[in-house]
Structure formats: C-alpha cells, structure tokens
Amino acid sequence: MVARIFALSLILQSCTSIQKKEFAASVRITNENYDEAIPILNEILVVNPQNKWALLKRSMCYSFLENYVEAEKDISKLIELYPKNAEYFFHRGEILYEGGAYSESISDVQKALHLTANRKLRSYCYYLLANAEFEQKNYLAAIRACTDYLKYAQHENAYILRGHAYFQLKDYSDALHDYNTALSVAKKNRRHITNNLFYYNKGRSELACGLYKEASVDFKRLNDEFYKTKEYRELCEQKIKECK
C-alpha cells in the first residue's frame, strides 16, 4: 500500500511538473519568444516523446523561426501517430509551402480536405491550395481553389490571388472584375489594400480593357521605379489625349 501511494505521488509530481513546463512554454510562445520556448518543450518531450501538445507547439516554434526542416519533422511525427487528423496534414502543408515544397504542400492539403468536413479548416485548405498552385504556375487550378475558398468565406486576398491568376492567363476582364471586388470587400471590412503589385496588375488590366483614366489613377499610386510604371503612365496619358 505504501509503495502504491509513493508511486501515485511521483506520478502526480510528474504531471504537475509537466503542467508547469507547458505553462512556461505557452507564455514564451504568446510573447513570440520561440527560441526560449523550444528548450522547455524539449524537456517535456524527453519525459514523453509522444506528447502531441509539445510536438505541435515545437513544430509551430520552428516554423516561426523559419526552421522548416525541424518543423516538418515534428508535425510528421504527429501524422504518424494520428494519420487521420486533417489539421496535422494542413499544418504540414503550411510548413512545406513556406519551405518552397509546393507540390508536396498540395498533396498534404488535398489529404486534409479528404479527411475533414469542418468548414473553417476547409476554407484554410483551399486558400493554401490556391497559393501553392499559383506558385507552381498552375493558374487554372489556383482559380478553382480560390473559387472553392470563396464558397466558405469572403476575403479580398482570395479575390486578389484569383485576379493575379487571371492576369497571368491574360484574361484581363476577369482579372479586373476580381481586383475591383477585392477593393469592395476590403472597404466593407474597413481594410486597405496597399500592395504595389495589386495596383500595377490592376492598372495593366484596365489598360488592356481600354480604361485609360482608371489605369492612370492606379499607376500614379506607384513610383517610377516599380517595373515599367512610368512608361505605362505616359501611355495612359497619351491614350487619354487621343480619346479627347
């Protein structure tokens, strides 16, 4: 009986110690001190190498520190332990994407989509999938993924990305429609689009559609050193004069 009580006491002490370490790691992660959180998470994993909380948090810390190799190792361990967990496949897809492994990222995101019916997670998956497909220059696939994302949520970034895909395909009318929709969505949510490439591509699309005044306004947002902004702005001014 005494031995059992002693053993139970040790277990409780161990649990309390782990809880303290988890709290300490959480505080550092919240404060974005990821390099300080990792040694604490290491201590937890020495005691229990399969601690899913510690593995996930350490993977996240490595990812924020742009150590994608180590981040992938931890999330891959979780996938081995829980092969039907869609979130883990999604997170590994994120890590692979950030590390430039776009085709592998696409594969993991597709697995996550197959495993989950959760609307929020599916929306995240489709947006990540759209970005990965775009990086692979699979513009039609990127358009489809953006369209799927927009069934779940409305965000200007999805319209911008789909607009960029249309732009790459030289479908300037559809690109312009998405760029204008992005502005409307951002305005509705009291956000501002400040990305130079957005206004450059929007201006190019307007120029291609014969909307010279609108294009001129967009090109004036950019400085002369951004791509061929000065040339396009001068072309707009010339076209506006010709139309008078």
Residue ranges with predicted function:
Residues 19-47, 57-60, 64:
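Alpha-helical segment of the N-proximal tetratricopeptide repeat
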Residues 30-31, 64, 98-99, 128-131, ...:
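Register position in tetratricopeptide repeats
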